Amino acid sequence: MSANALGMIIFAYLCGSISSAILICRLARLPDPRKFGSGNPGATNVLRIGGKLAAASVLICDVLKGMIPVWLAYYLNVPPFYLGIVAIAACLGHIYPVFFHFKGGKGVATAFGSIAAIGWDLSGLIAGTWLLTVLLSGYSSLGAIISALLAPFYVWWFKPEFTYPVALLSCLVLYRHHDNIQRLWRGQESRIWHKLKKKTEKTDKEIIQEAKEQEKED
């Protein structure tokens, strides 16, 4: 392993460790996403507690956390295999952030950003798969699961040199969704449309009050 590859792997992990969901919620004076809603510091949970603008901001930042390190590694001529390891490091940082007590999100947006840096054709297929699944089912988590399952096949078809690291990345995302898989199986997973409806029916004061009550229970 070259010094460039090792340096980019470390850099990617540190970038991933910056939890945009937590920071944006603090800036917007919203409840801590780790203690409210699903407890997951990601864009979907921020959508539940903070609305579309906050969720979109989190989504963009999470995508960039994966995209920027992989792009930089590519321009530093890091070999394809280690380029994939850089992508995995960014996702590991998002999932186990060193700056936030190793309690992070599920890595979907960061994984998407990493793959987008490898090829826009791949990112288009994955985004289309997620969107189609969500539109048909209403489940954001199911969209992530189906996309993670199909991503290695898309990569194998277009850029086979990245198949192995992307397969590892997909396994990581699927592992982080094991609770969602169980809830989907039991029919207990909430649909994304339900989250939006609940958000519009509540005032900001009610949301913050619920967060405080949940913190007391914890």
Curated annotation (Swiss-Prot):
Superkingdom of the organism of origin: Bacteria
UniProt main location, coarse: membrane
A biological process term (GO) from this entry: phospholipid biosynthetic process
Pathway info: Lipid metabolism; phospholipid metabolism
EC number: 2.3.1.275
Pfam families: G3P_acyltransf
SUBUNIT field: Probably interacts with PlsX.
Function as written in the Swiss-Prot or TrEMBL entry: Catalyzes the transfer of an acyl group from acyl-phosphate (acyl-PO(4)) to glycerol-3-phosphate (G3P) to form lysophosphatidic acid (LPA). This enzyme utilizes acyl-phosphate as fatty acyl donor, but not acyl-CoA or acyl-ACP.
Family, per entry: Belongs to the PlsY family.
Name of the molecule in the record: Glycerol-3-phosphate acyltransferase
Gene transcribed to yield this protein: plsY
